[in-house]
């Protein structure tokens, strides 16, 4: 079998291209798609720990720390000491971070619709179901 026909290759390659496309759309706003995904999670649920954010985004803690450092430097989030556990910090979205997330969300929806328009609705739903099944399986193989 040719490597380009491997499911892993196709998934990774497609995911990378989608990430690059979204990052290109976000470039005028000074944020990458990876940074935006974390910022968006925080706008949905503010004041969570880095550890909890890492679990919810399924990103490793080192990667989350790097992304949060970038978001904090840009003034889009704040880290405050957790009064319940002094070893951890709670992450808060600043007003400018919340504004940016709300500005970018329609762009993400537009890109999603653009991609979903390539296939009939039934195929999109089947694809999502299949990808969730694979993702759950991979979660259980750790």
Protein language model features and the residues they cover:
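N-terminal leader segment of winged-helix/HTH proteins
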Residues: 1-29
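Short, locally clustered residues in the helix-turn-helix/winged-helix DNA-binding domain
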Residues: 12, 40-44, 105
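Pre-recognition alpha-helix immediately N-terminal to the DNA-recognition helix
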Residues: 17, 21, 37-40, 99
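Charged, amphipathic alpha-helical coiled-coil/dimerization segments
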Residues: 19, 69-129
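Residues within helix-turn-helix
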Residues: 50-51, 62, 69, 89
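The alpha-helix within a helix-turn-helix
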Residues: 54
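C-terminal regulatory/oligomerization modules of transcriptional regulators
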Residues: 122-142
């Amino acid at each position: 079998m040719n490597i380009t026909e491997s499911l892993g290759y196709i998934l990774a390659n497609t995911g990378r291209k989608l990430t690059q496309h979204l990052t290109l759309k976000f470039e005028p706003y000074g944020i990458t798609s990876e940074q935006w995904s974390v910022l968006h999670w925080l706008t949905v649920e503010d004041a969570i720990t880095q550890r909890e954010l890492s679990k919810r985004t399924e990103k490793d803690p080192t990667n989350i720390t790097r992304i949060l450092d970038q978001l904090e430097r840009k003034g889009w989030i704040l880290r405050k000491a957790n009064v319940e556990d002094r070893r951890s910090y709670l992450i808060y979205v600043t007003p400018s971070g919340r504004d940016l997330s709300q500005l970018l969300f329609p762009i993400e929806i537009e890109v999603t619709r653009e991609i979903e328009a390539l296939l009939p609705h039934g195929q999109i739903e089947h694809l999502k179901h299949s990808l969730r099944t694979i993702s759950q399986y991979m979660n259980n193989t750790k």
